[in-house]
Curated annotation (Swiss-Prot):
EC number(s) on file: 2.7.1.23
Gene: nadK
UniProt protein name: NAD kinase
Gene3D superfamilies: Probable inorganic polyphosphate/atp-NAD kinase, domain 1 (3.40.50.10330), Probable inorganic polyphosphate/atp-NAD kinase, domain 2 (2.60.200.30)
Annotated catalysed reactions: NAD(+) + ATP = ADP + NADP(+) + H(+)
Superkingdom per UniProt: Bacteria
Molecular function GO terms recorded: ATP binding; metal ion binding; NAD binding; NAD+ kinase activity
Length: 291
């Protein structure tokens, strides 16, 4: 592995200095570094810039400098090529990023020496069907979320699993999540935590107006269909909280397991529950700080 695609979140503090150090280290160690043209120009490194398609085709590994959000975006972009991704964390505690800043160069040395393994994660595909025709197709790693806008009235959704009627929900929305997404929006809405090596789908209603509406765990090969019955205002489909599509009354959203899988480079055995505990404790401490 000696051709790296470097993806940089330019909004992170001191990212230009960190990126420069990483690029110099990789080049000194005989590696080639590629970046998106716009990012390369922003960092004063236009010589490294290539078109997006060339970046994905030529890079043997995508090295992401940012947080989990940047890693999610990159994982979706490269899923079709099967390019593995590894993240250097510049954000808060991350579930997906692998390397912390103090460990950057020892970790890169392990990577060059082949001391790593590939962890695959299930992804989701969502299609919007409007008047019998597919009008949008989206790919996600965490979740597909159907939700009303901030000022919209209660919405009504009819849900089917494998063409079998499940229920009609009066709710703020519905989350269909992967195991990776179980610790994201679904968790905040009362869904269960699922370890990421499993293949399954989670369905979590958002603020349902009935006490009996509860989260569900279903088989990974299930096909979930949500019919938008009515709603007073804007209703959106969002994937991973980053890519959205506006829905209309009578639209159908069909969610299934994607054919492609996200591929993450791991340098060490990950203790999922330690990371989970730290995240939950961090949220608790933040809540105390607002009292």
């Amino acid at each position: 592995m000696n051709v790296f695609g470097l993806v940089v979140n330019l909004n992170k503090k001191e990212v230009d200095e960190v990126a420069g150090q990483i690029i110099r280290w990789l080049e000194i160690n005989g590696c080639r570094v590629l970046m998106e043209e716009e990012t390369a120009r922003s960092l004063g490194l236009a010589r490294l810039g290539v078109p997006q398609r060339q970046l994905v085709e030529q890079a043997q590994c995508m090295l992401v400098l940012g947080g989990d959000g940047t890693l999610l975006r990159t994982a979706r972009r490269v899923a079709f090529s099967g390019t593995p991704v590894i993240g250097i964390n510049l954000g808060h505690l991350g579930f997906l990023t692998e390397i912390d800043i103090p460990d950057t160069f020892p970790s890169l040395r392990k990577l060059l020496d082949g001391q790593y393994y590939i962890e695959e994660r299930m992804m989701l595909e969502a299609r919007v069907i409007r008047q019998g025709a597919a009008v949008e197709k989206l790919l996600g790693l965490n979740d597909a979320v159907i939700t009303k806008g901030a000022f919209a009235r209660i919405s009504y959704f009819e849900m089917y699993v494998n063409d079998e009627y499940v229920n009609t929900y009066s709710a703020d929305g519905i989350i269909i999540a992967s195991p990776t997404g179980s610790t994201a929006y679904s968790l905040s809405a009362g869904g269960p935590v699922v370890t990421p090596e499993l293949d399954l789908m989670l369905i979590t209603p958002i603020c349902p107006h009935t006490l009996w509406a509860r989260p569900m765990v279903i088989a990974p090969d299930s096909v979930v269909r949500v019919d938008v019955l009515k709603g007073g205002g804007e209703i959106m489909l969002t994937m991973d909280g980053q890519h959205g599509f506006s829905l209309r009354r009578n639209d159908q959203v069909v969610v299934r397991r994607a054919e492609k899988r996200a591929r993450f480079i791991r340098l060490k055995s990950r203790d999922f529950f330690t990371v989970l505990r730290k995240k939950l404790e961090g949220n608790r401490d933040n809540a105390k700080g607002t009292e």
